[in-house]
């Protein structure tokens, strides 16, 4: 289908099985062919996270989202400073809506990336605040959807297009719904195109 970036959820089954699956994918596709991202949704414990991150880093992954559950700033800051695999904050950003809270969180944890979900992070204006603060600290970012209908997905896609961010964005949830409005966007190879 032309996709160059795949995100896989991990942490739900046995770690060795998940690692074997990732090794299988990587044995068939180099990181130049397929960018692999993983999302642990906070499934790792602070005590075993570093060992798992080291093992995952051997697979030339792009990054891992939220390795430990949100709210453990000290532990997450340690991981972001010591991990051989870049860490992206996701759930960690939820609930921090003032500029000062955003500055404090990013300055304390210093992740390599943050993931902006406008529906969960204060809308488009809140997302722009996260992006501005991240860029001040040289923190990378990308935008994803969070189970919006095609109306929300269309708005997020058009907003996303206003930025000059070469990273693959996560805008693919519209196909999950069986009763959805028509979408003026279409996926061609690895890009989203406005069709109407």
Predicted regions located by residue number:
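Generic secondary-structure signature for well-ordered alpha-helical cores
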Residues: 27-30, 58, 84, 136-139, ...
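Flexible C-terminal active-site loop/helix
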Residues: 146-196
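Short, surface-exposed acidic/glycine-rich loop or hinge patches that mediate macromolecular interfaces
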Residues: 11-13, 43, 69, 92-94, ...
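Hydrophobic faces of well-ordered beta-strands that scaffold small-molecule active sites
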Residues: 4-8, 34-40, 64-65, 87-90, ...
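Active-site-adjacent C-terminal substructures of enzyme catalytic domains
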Residues: 105-145
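Metal-dependent enolase-superfamily TIM-barrel catalytic cores that perform enediolate-based chemistry
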Residues: 1-83
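Catalytic cores of alpha/beta
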Residues: 46-56, 74, 96-109, 125-131, ...
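A general structural motif
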Residues: 67-72, 89-101, 119-126
